[in-house]
UniProtKB/Swiss-Prot annotation:
It comes from Solidesulfovibrio magneticus (strain ATCC 700980 / DSM 13731 / RS-1) (Desulfovibrio magneticus). It comes from the Bacteria. Its EC number is 2.7.7.3. Its main location: cytoplasm. This is Phosphopantetheine adenylyltransferase. NCBIfam families: coaD_prev_kdtB, cyt_tran_rel. Keywords: ATP-binding, Coenzyme A biosynthesis, Cytoplasm, Magnesium, Nucleotide-binding, Nucleotidyltransferase, Transferase. The record marks 22 as: Transition state stabilizer. It catalyses: (R)-4'-phosphopantetheine + ATP + H(+) = 3'-dephospho-CoA + diphosphate. It is found in: Cytoplasm. ATP binds at residues 14-15, 22, 93-95, 103, 128-134. The gene is coaD.
Amino acid sequence: MDSQKSCIAVYPGTFDPLTNGHVSLVRRAAMIFGTVIVAVAGDSHKTPLFTLDERVAIAEQVFANDRRVLVEGFKGLLVNYVKSREANVILRGMRAVSDFEFEFQMALMNRKLDRTIETVFIMTDYKWLYISSTIVKEVAKHGGDIRGMVPEHVRERMLERFGPANGSGEGA
């Protein structure tokens, strides 16, 4: 068990925004691995709501009191970043069977690029199965209430971005 506790896991994602599903997965993983690095991706085919620096700052605020969790931004190939951090696990969350095909392909490619790095899948807590960053952004953009889907300070940042009638449920 001691070897598991010294294991460093990297949880990559755009986290735009960071949801309660992400937070739950990181906290559960931190009970398994010695350290979890929340690796906020700067290179993405997505157009982010928040800049890389903003997303890193948001995640740092959420995990500020958990010494087992580090937050860093990164750009480039994930496997190279994982190696640079001397980590040996890529952590991925699974919400539903629909996530599996893409995640399986990515895990196989990462394995091809570096056979010393393992991908570990953790099932999302059932409370968060329906939540994704994309859905949260759409709900907030159209004035829906996102309370309980994201940490409160994330909701506040989204209100700043979309306006007071959005993300609070007050304008819906």
